[in-house]
C-alpha cells in the first residue's frame, strides 16, 4: 500500500447533507415535544417535560449527533441517539445491535460491511477503512483522542470504543461481568458505557434501576459527565459509604458470616409449648424449627413459617402460637440484634477473633455489617436491576453481598494492583464468589508506552499483583526518576505546568484519593509511600511521569 495520502472515498457534501437532515429531524421531534407544553397532568409534570426538552436541545446544540458510518449496500450513520423521519433511519443509536459492526468489524472479519468511516473531531476530517480491500485513509480517531490533553472530567468514549471494550459493553443483560483491567485500559469506560447500553437493550431496566458505585467523591466528579453525554443522566452514581454508611476494618472481617450463623442458631431454644389447652411436644417444635431454618428468607419470615407449621399441625391460630413461642423462636429486629452484637462476651462465644472484637466494640458503626444483619433479620429488597461497581477490588465480602442483595445484575471493574483495603476481596476472589471467570484487559490506551513499561517494571520488582500492560502509544518521553529535595519536586511541577493543562502532585497523604482519576502529567512524591501507593499514583499519568524518591 502506498504511503501517499489518498483522496477520501466518501462524499463530504453528501455527509454534510445527511447530517443536516438528521439535525432537522431532531429539531422537528423536539418541536413536537415543545408543542405539548402545558399538557401534563399537573404543574410538576409540565415542569418536567419542559426541563427534558430544554436539556435535550442544549445537548444537541453541543454534541455532534453523528460520529461515524458503516456501509453494507447502503450507508448507516452511527450516533449518540437513533433518529428517524417518515420511516427512514437517519441515524442508528450506537447501542443498537446493528451498530456493533462500527466497533467490532475488522479487515479479518468485516461482519458483512464494506466500509467504516469515523469522524475525527469534525465531519471534514474522516478516517476511512475499506474493509474489503484493506485500504485506509486519514488519521485514527483513537490515537487523536489518546494524544489530547486530559481534562478535569472523563469524556464519553462512544466514538472510539475498541473491539474488546465493545464486546464487554454488549454482554447479555443477565451476564455477570468481573473485569480486571490495568490502569488506562478503559475498564471504567466499559462500566459506564455498559450502564447506558443496558438501559437501551433491556426493557426491564430504566435509568432509575441502574446503580453506579465509585470509590470516592473525587472519582464521581471525574466521571460525572459521561452518562449525561450518553443520554442517561438519571442513573444514580454514588459511593458505597453514601449508599450504606462507612465500613470499618473490624466490621468487614469475613469471620462475621460464621459468627452470625452461630448467633442465629443460639437464639433458637426448642422446648415443649402450651397454647391454651394444647400441648405441643418438644420434638414437634424442634422439627418445625428445623424446617423453617432451612429457608433462605429473613429471620422474621422464617419465624412466620415456624409458627404456621405448628398452627396447621395442631389446628391452632398462628397468632396464638406466635405469642406462646416467643422464648422458643424470639422475634428479633435488626436493631435489637445489633445491640446484642455489641457484647464482647457474646462475640467471644460466637468465635470472633480477639482483634475483630476489640476493633468492633470501639467502632461507632459499620454500614456493610448492619446491612448483613438487616438482610438476615428483616430482609433487603432488590432495588436495582443492575449495579456497576468501579474499583471493585476493594469490596469486602460483606460489601459485595450488600451490592448483590440490591441488584439482580452485576458488573465489577477494577485493578488488583490498586487494592487499598486489607479486607478487599480482590477481583479473582470476587469472581469466584460470584461463580464466574474474570475477564482481563491489558492494552494501555490512556497512557504512553513509556509509562506503561515503567509500571510493569515497578510491579515486577515489588511483587505487585498487576495486569501486565501492553503500551501502544510510544511518545519518546521517558519516565524521570529523581532523588532529592522539595526543591526538585517543585521544579518538576513547574516544568510540567508549562507543558500541560492538568498536572497533579501526589504524595503519601492523598495517594489513594486519586484512584480512578487521570491527569496529563503527574509528579509522585514517593516519600512515605509503599510500592503499591507509588504504583497507584504513577498510573494516574497519561503523558508524562516524574517520580521523586527520598534521599536515603
Language-model region placement:
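Extended, charged low-complexity regulatory segments
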Residues: 1-167
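P-loop NTPase Walker
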Residues: 2, 10-13, 19-22, 129-137, ...
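Short secondary-structure junctions and interdomain/linker hinges
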Residues: 26, 33, 164, 168, ...
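Non-catalytic, well-ordered alpha-helical scaffold segments
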Residues: 64-67, 155, 166, 217, ...
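Alpha-helical nucleic-acid-binding subdomain
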Residues: 128, 196-388, 393-405, 417-419
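Catalytic cores of large soluble enzymes that bind and process phosphate-bearing ligands
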Residues: 149, 153, 252, 298, ...
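Conserved helicase motor core of SF1/SF2 NTP-dependent helicases
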Residues: 156, 205-208, 217-243, 248, ...
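Short secondary-structure boundary/capping elements
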Residues: 160, 190, 365-368, 488, ...
Amino acid at each position: 500500500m502506498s504511503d501517499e495520502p489518498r483522496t477520501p472515498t466518501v462524499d463530504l457534501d453528501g455527509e454534510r447533507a445527511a447530517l443536516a437532515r438528521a439535525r432537522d429531524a431532531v429539531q422537528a421531534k423536539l418541536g413536537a415535544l415543545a408543542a405539548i407544553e402545558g399538557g401534563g397532568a399537573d404543574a410538576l409534570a409540565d415542569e418536567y417535560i419542559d426541563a427534558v426538552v430544554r436539556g435535550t436541545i442544549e445537548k444537541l446544540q453541543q454534541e455532534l449527533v453523528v460520529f461515524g458510518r458503516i456501509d453494507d449496500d447502503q450507508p448507516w450513520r452511527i450516533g449518540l441517539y437513533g433518529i428517524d423521519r417518515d420511516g427512514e433511519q437517519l441515524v442508528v443509536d450506537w447501542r443498537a445491535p446493528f451498530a456493533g459492526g462500527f466497533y467490532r468489524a475488522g479487515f479479518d472479519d468485516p461482519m458483512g460491511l464494506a466500509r467504516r468511516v469515523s469522524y475525527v473531531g469534525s465531519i471534514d476530517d474522516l478516517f476511512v477503512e475499506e474493509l474489503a480491500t484493506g485500504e485506509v485513509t486519514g488519521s485514527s480517531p483513537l490515537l487523536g483522542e489518546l494524544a489530547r490533553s486530559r481534562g478535569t472530567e472523563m469524556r464519553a468514549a462512544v466514538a472510539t470504543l475498541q473491539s474488546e471494550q465493545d464486546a464487554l459493553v454488549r454482554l447479555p443483560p443477565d451476564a455477570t461481568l468481573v473485569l480486571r483491567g490495568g490502569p488506562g485500559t478503559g475498564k471504567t469506560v466499559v462500566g459506564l458505557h455498559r450502564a447506558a447500553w443496558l438501559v437501551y437493550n433491556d426493557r426491564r431496566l430504566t435509568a432509575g434501576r441502574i446503580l453506579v458505585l465509585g470509590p470516592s467523591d473525587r472519582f464521581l466528579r471525574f466521571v460525572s459527565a459521561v452518562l449525561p453525554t450518553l443520554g442517561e443522566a438519571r442513573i444514580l452514581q454514588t459511593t458505597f459509604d453514601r449508599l450504606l454508611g462507612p465500613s470499618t476494618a473490624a466490621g468487614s472481617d469475613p469471620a462475621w458470616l460464621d459468627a452470625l450463623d452461630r448467633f442465629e442458631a443460639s437464639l433458637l431454644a426448642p422446648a415443649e409449648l402450651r397454647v391454651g389447652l394444647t400441648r405441643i411436644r418438644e420434638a414437634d417444635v424442634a422439627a418445625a424449627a428445623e424446617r423453617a431454618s432451612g429457608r433462605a428468607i429473613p429471620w422474621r419470615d422464617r419465624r412466620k413459617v415456624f409458627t404456621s407449621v405448628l398452627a396447621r399441625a395442631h389446628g391452632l391460630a398462628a397468632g396464638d402460637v406466635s405469642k406462646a413461642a416467643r422464648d422458643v423462636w424470639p422475634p428479633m429486629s435488626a436493631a435489637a440484634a445489633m445491640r446484642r452484637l455489641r457484647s464482647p462476651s457474646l462475640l467471644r462465644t460466637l468465635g470472633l477473633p480477639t482483634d475483630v472484637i476489640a476493633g468492633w466494640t470501639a467502632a461507632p458503626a459499620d454500614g456493610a455489617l448492619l446491612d448483613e444483619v438487616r438482610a438476615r433479620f428483616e430482609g433487603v429488597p432488590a432495588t436495582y436491576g443492575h449495579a456497576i461497581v468501579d474499583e471493585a477490588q476493594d469490596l469486602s465480602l460483606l460489601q459485595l453481598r450488600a451490592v448483590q442483595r440490591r441488584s439482580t445484575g452485576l458488573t465489577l471493574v477494577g485493578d488488583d494492583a490498586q487494592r487499598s483495603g486489607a479486607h478487599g476481596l480482590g477481583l479473582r476472589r470476587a469472581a469466584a464468589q460470584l461463580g464466574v471467570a474474570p475477564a482481563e484487559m491489558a492494552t494501555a490506551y490512556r497512557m504512553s508506552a513509556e509509562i506503561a513499561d515503567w509500571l510493569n517494571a515497578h510491579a515486577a520488582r515489588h511483587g505487585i499483583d498487576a495486569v501486565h500492560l501492553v503500551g501502544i502509544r510510544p511518545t519518546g518521553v521517558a519516565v524521570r526518576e529523581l532523588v532529592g529535595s522539595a526543591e526538585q519536586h517543585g521544579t518538576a511541577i513547574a516544568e510540567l505546568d508549562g507543558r500541560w493543562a492538568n498536572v497533579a502532585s501526589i504524595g503519601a497523604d492523598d495517594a489513594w484519593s486519586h484512584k480512578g482519576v487521570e491527569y496529563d502529567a503527574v509528579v509522585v512524591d514517593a516519600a512515605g509511600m509503599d510500592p503499591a501507593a507509588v504504583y497507584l499514583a504513577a498510573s494516574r499519568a497519561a503523558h508524562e511521569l516524574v517520580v521523586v524518591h527520598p534521599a536515603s
